From Swiss-Prot:
Gene: pth
Domain of life: Bacteria
PANTHER family for the chain: PEPTIDYL-TRNA HYDROLASE
Residue numbers annotated as active site: H22 (proton acceptor)
Keywords, sorted A to Z: Cytoplasm, Hydrolase, RNA-binding, tRNA-binding
Organism listed in the record: Shewanella frigidimarina (strain NCIMB 400)
Record-given protein name: Peptidyl-tRNA hydrolase
UniProt entry tagged with the keyword Transmembrane helix: no
């Protein structure tokens, strides 16, 4: 059984960023909220939109920070501190350059890999890296100088379909995570690749 009490989807705020690759984490949380039939509501004290959902009979908070990506930790720490949620009880969903579109993987701990949202969350949690991540593959532009424009751009339709399929599979795997355990959820999700 999972001990996850907070699921965070990283994003930049505003309509101009809503469909950009950098917002893949938010797409996952939005899909979880839809499946759980709960509205994401703006909560200024948490600097984000949030919902209280039930997954397999257990309470979990959903959060999409409405700060910019590089200030995500302000939002995560505000909610986690208020509800006394420990880093190891947090799952952060984010876009991952080092994985192809159509792939998603769970991971516990590790560095930020250059991801500004993760970097700020780690700092805001007292440099504690021991939180869970859901890495959603978006692919890499092939040149590190093009990364900023790439993550803030929209994926072509075929790539977007693969990203969406991986998110759907991640949602199904999250249900396994809450109903069974992380090992089974990882086994299912890590063997999936959208074609």
């Amino acid at each position: 059984m999972s001990n996850i009490k907070l699921i965070v989807g990283l994003a930049n705020p505003g309509a101009e960023y809503a469909q950009t690759r950098h917002n893949a984490g938010a797409w996952y949380v939005q899909e979880l909220a839809r499946i759980c039939n709960v509205p994401l509501v703006a909560e200024s004290k948490y600097f984000g939109v949030t919902a209280r959902a039930t997954l397999h009979g257990r309470d979990v908070r959903l959060l999409i920070p409405t700060t910019y990506m590089n200030l995500s930790g302000k939002s995560v720490a505000a909610l986690a501190n208020f509800f006394r949620i420990l880093p190891e009880e947090i799952l952060v969903a984010h876009d991952e350059l080092d994985m192809d579109p159509g792939v998603a993987k769970f991971k516990l701990g590790g560095g930020h890999g250059g991801h500004n949202g993760l970097k700020d969350i780690i700092a805001s949690l007292g440099n504690d890296k021991n939180f869970h991540r859901l890495r959603i593959g978006i692919g890499h532009p092939g040149d590190k100088n093009k990364v900023s424009g790439y993550v803030l751009g929209r994926a072509p339709a075929v790539e977007q379909e693969r990203i969406n399929a991986a998110i759907d599979e991640a949602v199904r795997s999250t249900e396994i995570l809450f109903n069974q355990d992380m090992a089974k959820a990882m086994h299912r999700l890590h063997s999936f690749k959208a074609e």
